[in-house]
Amino acid sequence: MTDQRTLGSETAIERDVVVVGAGPAGLMAARTLVAAGRTVAVLEARDRVGGRTWSKTVDGAFLEIGGQWISPDQTELLALVDELGLETYQRYREGESVYLAPDGTRHTYTGSMFPAGESTIVEMEKLVALLDGLVAEIGATEPWAHPAARELDTISFHHWLRQHSDDEAACSNIGIFVAGGMLTKPAHAFSVLQAVLMAASAGSFSNLVDEDFILDRRVVGGMQSVSETMAAELGEDVVFLDTPVRTIRWAGDGGTYAEHVPGTPVTVWSDRLTVRAKDVVVAVPPNLYSRISFEPPLPRLQHQMHQHQSLGLVIKVHAVYETPFWRDKGLSGTGFGAHELSQEVYDNTNHGDPRGTLVGFVSDERADELFGLPAEERRRLILESLSHYLGEEALHPVVYYESDFGSEEWTRGAYAASYDLGGLHRYGAHQRTPVGPIRWACSDLAAEGYQHVDGALRQGRLAAAEVLGAGSLTGAER
């Protein structure tokens, strides 16, 4: 052990398992292992738990900076929320929604389908039906194994939509649900197969486009409280904050992962602790794997695969007002506009709060452009966009905040990782393959619940089950 490798780790401890990352996946893995009688150390680089779920008070307003919504199919998360004694509440959705058409005209409507014109609606329904068919045929568990996987993974979602419809408004509107709303990448940057996985993880594409389904409920006190409650149960002798992991080493010089013998000691070096264990669960997104030195190095396939997984980019905008003024106008606060700066807006008022909160989203290339502007200009343009949906009152919030996970050292994007064109069918089957004593767990690798807290919890539980020797869970449980 050299001075360089220890990196200032002055305290050495022994545990059965080290978990890297104290987000929902890592904490669920730790919780499952501790319940089975294993000793665990959870090492978290940040000064908080929760990963990409994060709540904080800004100028007196409680804001959910990260992930926040629960849909009815997210049974793993719903069961845990109940078990932890937490409560949920429905997103406000009474009144009319607003659709901003490509020509800039404003339309109010009720129901789930935009008032985009009869012919465009017909085309949108056709595209949704085609995607629902692919979802039913391919599923979320092993999309790369489908006979048409290569074909569907080597054409962009943008071009596939336009192969099946010549209605540009229909293509743009359907594209927004996956591109802007989920993967936060331009529709030309990911494949149809990746879009199908995203939809299959929610049960169907119809579910994905139904905001009353996919954005159904929130946790009272914020989604981060799920992780905070799990961490509090585990205790400070299990969860270590401000502890970025630098090196994971299990063999002497010349060792290979192919030679790994279960139970071989693993040493994990961090800035604060050196931990000796038998197994490791890496519970951070794939774009951060390269922040860790692995000794021996990861296999070639892993090195290549991780370079084809990246996070998107989105600005989550929070605007707080003295009252939810849009409700007085008979509006729900929900708005969509594929060509608008903020492509979506929702009523995000907190439980029991007399003030009103709007949340809007500016994704991918639009976010790039805005981040090149001074903060005040960015704020002006975003609020102007919100006003197009809900009126001039939106220009004057009492609190304004932009979530920017792209600049976070230990996140570097939002919402989650996806493959570039051709990557999913090429590498998907290998993304959870254990490497020696190391297992992987995060929402980015999930089937059901992909990119969501529910998927993170499923992955954490699955990794723990593998460590415990329980074998793989069934595809339906993943």
From Swiss-Prot:
Its cofactor is FAD. It catalyses: putrescine + O2 + H2O = 4-aminobutanal + H2O2 + NH4(+). FAD binds at residues 15-70. Pfam families: Amino_oxidase (PF01593). The keyword Cytoplasm does not apply. It is an enzyme of class 1 (oxidoreductase). The keyword Flavoprotein applies. Its EC number is 1.4.3.10. Keywords: FAD, Flavoprotein, Oxidoreductase. GO terms for molecular function: putrescine oxidase activity. It comes from the Bacteria. Belongs to the flavin monoamine oxidase family. This is Putrescine oxidase.
